[in-house]
C-alpha cells in the first residue's frame, strides 16, 4: 500500500498542471479578495460582522479546480495509456484506487485550506490598505473550518468519482460544471423545495450557498447537508469501486 501511495503522490507532484492550477487559483483568489472585495468594499459592508467569514466561504467556488486536479490524476492514466502499468505494479486494484482517493483528498483539503485562509486575510489587508477598518468580526473558527474543508474535499471527491466512472478527461471536467449549473437547475424546476436534496445543492448548503434559489426557507443545516452529500458519495463510490475492479479486468490484469 505504501509504495502505491508514494507513486500516486509522485504523479501529483511531478505534473505541471498541479502547480499551474494551484498558482492560478491562488492568484485569482488574491486579486478578487484583496482588490475587488477588500479594496473596493463600500462603507455599508464595513459594518458587517460576518464579512470575513463570508469571504472564507464565498471564494470556495474555486474548489472546482481541486476537483479538476483529481480528474487529471485519474484520467491521465487512460489518456497516456499508463493505467496498465499502474495496475500491474500493485497486487490490488483496490489499493490503487484507495491511493488515488487519499492523494486527491489531501490535495483537495490543502486547496480548500489555502482558499479559506487566504480569502479573509486578503480582504482584511485590502480594507486596511485603502485606509478603512472593519467592525469586530464574528468568526466561529471550528464551525467555519469544518465547512470549508468539507466543501473542498467534497468537490474533489466528486471530480475523482466522475473520472472513475467515465474514464474520460473532457467528460469528467464538463460534468463538474454541467451537473451543478445545468442539470440540477433543471431538476429544480420539477423538485421545487426538494432541490435541496440534490448532490451539489446539498454541498452548497454546507457553506450557506443557496445555489441561486430565492426561497431559502427549506435550506438544510450544514451538518444535515453534509450528511446528504455523503450518502451520494458513498453510493457513487461503491459503484465506482466495483467498476474499477472489474471493468476491463481480463484485458488489463
Where do the protein language model's features map onto the residues?
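A short amphipathic helical element positioned immediately N-terminal to and/or at the very start
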Residues: 2-13
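Short hydrophobic, aromatic-rich alpha-helical segments embedded in or entering the lipid bilayer
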Residues: 3-4, 192-213
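Helix-capping/transition residues at the boundaries of transmembrane alpha-helices
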Residues: 11, 75, 86-88, 159, ...
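Secretory targeting signals
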Residues: 17-73, 97-167, 177-178, 184-185, ...
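Transmembrane helix-loop junctions and nearby membrane-interface residues
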Residues: 33-40, 74, 189-192, 240, ...
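Transmembrane helix boundary and interhelical loop/hinge segments in multi-pass membrane proteins
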Residues: 70-89, 93-94
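Binding-cleft/active-site segments that stabilize strongly anionic ligands or cofactors
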Residues: 174-175, 190
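Junction motif at the cytosolic side of a transmembrane helix
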Residues: 230-253
Amino acid at each position: 500500500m505504501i509504495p502505491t501511495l508514494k507513486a500516486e503522490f509522485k504523479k501529483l507532484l511531478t505534473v505541471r498542471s498541479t502547480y499551474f492550477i494551484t498558482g492560478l487559483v491562488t492568484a485569482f483568489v488574491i486579486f478578487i479578495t484583496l482588490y475587488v472585495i477588500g479594496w473596493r468594499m463600500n462603507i455599508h459592508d464595513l459594518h458587517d460582522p460576518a464579512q470575513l467569514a463570508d469571504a472564507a466561504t464565498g471564494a470556495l467556488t474555486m474548489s472546482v479546480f481541486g476537483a479538476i486536479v483529481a480528474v487529471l490524476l485519474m484520467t491521465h492514466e487512460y489518456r497516456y495509456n499508463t493505467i496498465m502499468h499502474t495496475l500491474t505494479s500493485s497486487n490490488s486494484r483496490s489499493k490503487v484506487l484507495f491511493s488515488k482517493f487519499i492523494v486527491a483528498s489531501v490535495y483537495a483539503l490543502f486547496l480548500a485550506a489555502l482558499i479559506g485562509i487566504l480569502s479573509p486575510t486578503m480582504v482584511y489587508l485590502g480594507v486596511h490598505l485603502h485606509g478603512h477598518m472593519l467592525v469586530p468580526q464574528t468568526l466561529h473558527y471550528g464551525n467555519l473550518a469544518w465547512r470549508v474543508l468539507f466543501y473542498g474535499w467534497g468537490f474533489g471527491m466528486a471530480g475523482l468519482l466522475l473520472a472513475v466512472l467515465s474514464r474520460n478527461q473532457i467528460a469528467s471536467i464538463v460534468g463538474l460544471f454541467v451537473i451543478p449549473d445545468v442539470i440540477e437547475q433543471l431538476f429544480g424546476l420539477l423538485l421545487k423545495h426538494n432541490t435541496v436534496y440534490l448532490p451539489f445543492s446539498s454541498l452548497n448548503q454546507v457553506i450557506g450557498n443557496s445555489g441561486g434559489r430565492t426561497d431559502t426557507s427549506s435550506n438544510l443545516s450544514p451538518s444535515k447537508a453534509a450528511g446528504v452529500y455523503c450518502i451520494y458519495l458513498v453510493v457513487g463510490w461503491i459503484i465506482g469501486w466495483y467498476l474499477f475492479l472489474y471493468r476491463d479486468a481480463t484485458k488489463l490484469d
